[in-house]
Amino acid sequence: IQFKDNISIRESEEMDLFGYMKTNKKDEKDKKGGSLTREATVRLSNAISLEPYRSDMDFLNNKGFADRIGEHPNLANIEQHLSYYTYTVTIDLSKIGKDGDIELDNKEKCRRVVEFLEIIKVLNRNIRGRQENLSPLFVVGGVYEIANPFFLGRIKLKGDKNGFKINKQAIEEVIQGTFLGKDLKEFTYVGMVDGVFINKEEFKGLFEDNFLSVDKFFGQLVKEVKEYYGVN
C-alpha cells in the first residue's frame, strides 16, 4: 500500500511534510524496478519519557461479553505509564512545497506550516476507548538559520516534595551558543502553562521578553513563518 503514482505534493500535504517512497514493479521495460523517494521536511523525534517506568499494570477482562453467554471471562493486562514526555519537531522551511520540478507558491507553503503548528498546539490521540491530551505544557524553540534540533535531549525533569521543575541549565547552555555569528538566545522563545512546573520564574528571568504562554509561543512562530514566506 502506497501513495498513487499520479499523486504529488501538490495534492498531498502529508507527502509534502512527511515524505514518501513509491516503489515500481519490475516489468519488461524496467527489469530492475526501483523506487521514488522524498525525505520528510518535518522531522519528529521519538517521544521520550522524563520519568522511569514503575511496572504499573492495567488488568482487563471481557466480563460483560462472558456474562451474556454464561462463560468465564478472559483476562489480559496492559502496561501503563503515566509520565511527562518530551519530543522535538524540526521543520525545514526552505524545502516545504518543493519536489523535483514542482514548487508551490509561498502562500500555500505558509498555510501548510501554520496549520501544522496549530495542530501541535492542540495535539491529542484516541486509543483504547479514551482520548489523551498531548498538547504541550512546556515549549522552547524558534525560527533559525538552520533546521537543527537544538533542544533534542536537553529537556530534563526534576522532582521534589514541592513539585516538578524543568532543568534550566541544559537549555541555558544551548541558547548561550551561536550559529553563523548570531546568538541563539535572540531567536529563541519559551512557553509554559501556568501551575504545572514550579520554576517558572527561573525561565522568566532567563528569557525575559521571550518568555511567553504556550499559545503566544505558537503565535510568535506563526508570525515568523509568515515573515519568512513573505505572507501577510
PLM regions and their residue ranges:
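RNA-binding basic/glycine-rich loop and surface signature characteristic of RAMP-family CRISPR effectors
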Residues: I1-N232
